[in-house]
């Protein structure tokens, strides 16, 4: 049996506006309506919403999720396309990790320079972040 939008949202732990947004973006299909005019969503749609939510938690963009659905919804070159996508996403994650490690090293260095409770205008952390003497 199908679900109304509020039931779908509750089952997937999202809000109704999120469901409508995914529909507008083409991530889920517009559902048929019952005789009362209510949209009735299938369990397959619920699975897609849960998949979208999981991918968002893993920091995938909606554009990337849309691309994944394009591959999943077409049986053709699925494995080849998924491999290429995975390679690209792995490189992107490696770049993000390197960026975060650079930020971490900078913050560790700045923490060592911080004497304690100097006024803000003499704080070496603020000076460095604003492009001051310790660039």
Curated annotation (Swiss-Prot):
Pfam families: MerR_1
Keyword presence, Amino-acid biosynthesis: no
Function text: Mediates the mercuric-dependent induction of mercury resistance operon. In the absence of mercury MerR represses transcription by binding tightly to the mer operator region; when mercury is present the dimeric complex binds a single ion and becomes a potent transcriptional activator, while remaining bound to the mer site.
UniProt-recorded Gene Ontology molecular function terms: DNA binding; DNA-binding transcription factor activity; mercury ion binding
Superkingdom, taxonomy of origin: Bacteria
InterPro entries found in the cross-reference section: DNA-bd_dom_put_sf, MerR, MerR-type_HTH_dom, MerR_fam
Binding-site positions, Hg(2+): 79, 114, 123
Protein name as catalogued: Mercuric resistance operon regulatory protein
Subunit structure: Homodimer.
Residue span(s) of domain HTH merR-type: 1-71
Residue ranges flagged as DNA-binding region: 5-24
Signal sequence residues: none
SUPFAM superfamilies xref list: Putative DNA-binding domain
Source organism (scientific name): Staphylococcus aureus
NCBIfam families the UniProt entry points to: MerR
Assigned keywords, A-Z: Activator, DNA-binding, Mercuric resistance, Mercury, Metal-binding, Plasmid, Repressor, Transcription, Transcription regulation
Record GO biological process: response to mercury ion
């Amino acid at each position: 049996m199908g679900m109304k939008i509020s039931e779908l949202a509750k089952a997937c732990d999202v809000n109704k506006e999120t469901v409508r947004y995914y529909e507008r973006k083409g991530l889920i299909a517009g559902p048929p309506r019952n005789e009362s005019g209510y949209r009735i969503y299938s369990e397959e749609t619920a699975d897609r919403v849960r998949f979208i939510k999981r991918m968002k938690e893993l920091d995938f963009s909606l554009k990337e999720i849309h691309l994944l659905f394009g591959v999943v919804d077409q049986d053709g070159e699925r494995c080849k396309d998924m491999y290429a996508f995975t390679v690209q996403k792995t490189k992107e994650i490696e770049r993000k990790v390197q960026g975060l490690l650079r930020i971490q090293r900078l913050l560790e260095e700045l923490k060592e320079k911080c004497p304690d409770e100097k006024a803000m205008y003499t704080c070496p952390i603020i000076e460095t972040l604003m492009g001051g003497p310790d660039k």
